[in-house]
Amino acid sequence: RPDRRVTGASNPGSNMNGVANQCCQNPYEIQPATIVEKISEAEDIETFRLRFVNQATRRGFRFAPGQFNMVYVFGVGEVAISIVSDPGQPGLLDHTIRVVGRVTKAIGRLKPGDVLGLRGPYGVGWPLDEARDKDVIIVTGGLGCAPVVGAIEYIFRRRDQYGAVKILHGVKTPHDLLYRARFD
């Protein structure tokens, strides 16, 4: 809906309240981030926990559940990856990737302590304010669950603000089930 206050790609670097992200002078500028942790989710799927190198960027970066960043590997290229963190837990950003393409394979070779670049956030966040005091059903499949993980985290941390929550996630095999440690 055009009247929604959730920001979108036309205003990168904004948070879900329509307030400009104050972390960067230019939201298109690549910000260096250190890999703090690398978590194996399933075969060829990993979550990278990142921390911005610059403290001002770390303090000022805001995003809405459902937005994504452009993740840049120096000398290789960049790829759009969903932010799978709760925006209410600042300081660290989680991004889950399937290691299949040239850029994601380069990301997959990185280790904790290595640095990559981030631009964003981009996209329209999920309309979670509209779901307050209502039941929520989330339906996903495969790695398609990544864009809603931030929303799930957000809802779980504010459980008293939402009705019943049902998550239906389809996968080929039990080994393909992602985020077990996070949601079990």
Residue positions per predicted region:
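FNR/FR-type flavoprotein reductase catalytic core
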Residues: 3, 9, 102-184
